[in-house]
From Swiss-Prot:
Transit peptide region: 1-47
Family according to the record: Belongs to the CCDC90 family.
GO CC terms in record: mitochondrial membrane
Domain of life: Eukaryota
Matching PANTHER family: COILED-COIL DOMAIN-CONTAINING PROTEIN 90B, MITOCHONDRIAL (PTHR14360:SF14), PROTEIN FMP32, MITOCHONDRIAL (PTHR14360)
Chain segments annotated as coiled-coil in the UniProt record: 142-175
Protein keywords: Coiled coil, Membrane, Mitochondrion, Transit peptide, Transmembrane, Transmembrane helix
Listed name of the protein: Coiled-coil domain-containing protein 90B, mitochondrial
Membrane topology according to the record: Single-pass membrane protein
Entries under Pfam families matching the protein: CCDC90-like (PF07798)
InterPro entries given in the database record: CCDC90-like (IPR024461)
Annotated transmembrane regions: 244-266
Source organism per UniProt: Xenopus tropicalis
Gene behind this protein: ccdc90b
Length: 267
């Protein structure tokens, strides 16, 4: 843009900056309102720079390369010439380029706050290696002492375990012997009980056979008596039968004689 309509607006959000360029070489630099933290400002060549530091983060001091020793990543003279060819006068072009250089330096400062130089890195690495060597030595010493302690504890535990094993072995043997003794006693008791029961069974069997023999003899005698009685009864019945036949025959002959007597008398 040319003349009185000269106006540039550079807007950067978050950690970045808002840059407003107006005609009359009036340059204002405002920190972002949406970022939390503390804004630090420096004034250089009529410009205000602002960078926000996040609150709650660790802040450490680092050696930042001085401004005069830094090299910009673009050609400022060529940029001034380019702006002049687009209608800016020399003062405006230099002002814009100076503002861009200031913004670049502010961004580099922000980046450098979280970085270290090679020398600092090497020193830090050497310090870390020294700490690691010290830790390694301490670990070796601790390892030896701990191993000695562990070895002693291990030996102590071995002895205690051996005592426990021997105690368990003795208890197992004692329990096994007691169990065997109880089993033998129970076996003897059962054998005696079985023998006694068998003896009682034999006595009962003998008594039963005796009673059976006695019963058989009694039954035989009874059968003999019954047979004798039956034979006697048969003999008696035969004798009674003969007497009855004789009586009947006599009765018949008597009746016939009476009948013949009456018959003769009737004639």
């Amino acid at each position: 843009m040319k003349g009185s309509q000269l106006y540039r607006h550079l807007s950067l959000q978050g950690n970045r900056l808002h840059l407003h360029l107006f005609q009359g070489k009036k340059l204002q630099l405002h920190p972002s309102q949406g970022h939390k933290g503390t804004a630090h400002r420096t004034w250089k060549k009529g410009f205000a720079t602002s960078a926000a530091l996040p609150a709650g983060y660790d802040v450490r001091q680092v050696e930042i390369t001085p401004l005069e020793q830094r090299k910009l990543t673009f050609d400022t003279h060529a940029l001034v010439r380019e702006l002049e060819t687009h209608g800016f006068d020399k003062v405006q072009a230099e002002t814009i380029v100076s503002a861009l250089a200031t913004l670049t330096n502010a961004s580099i400062d922000t980046v450098y706050r979280d970085m270290v130089t090679r020398a600092q890195q090497e020193i830090t690495v050497q310090q870390i290696m020294a700490h690691l060597d010290s830790i390694r030595k301490d670990m070796v010493i601790l390892e030896k002492s701990e191993f000695a302690t562990l070895r002693a504890e291990n030996e102590k535990m071995k002895i205690e375990l051996e005592h426990v094993r021997q105690h368990l072995l003795n208890e197992t043997n004692r329990i096994s012997a007691d169990a065997k003794l109880d089993m033998n006693l129970e076996r003897s008791r059962l054998t005696d009980l079985f023998t006694e029961q068998e003896k009682k069974l034999m006595e009962a069997s003998t008594e039963f056979h005796k009673k059976n023999a006695t019963t058989d003899s009694v039954i035989t005698e009874i059968n003999k008596k019954i047979d004798i009685d039956i034979a006697s009864l048969k003999t008696l019945m035969e004798s009674h039968k003969l007497d009855t036949v004789r009586y009947m025959a006599a009765s018949v002959f008597t009746c016939l004689a009476i009948a013949l007597g009456f018959y003769r008398l009737w004639k």
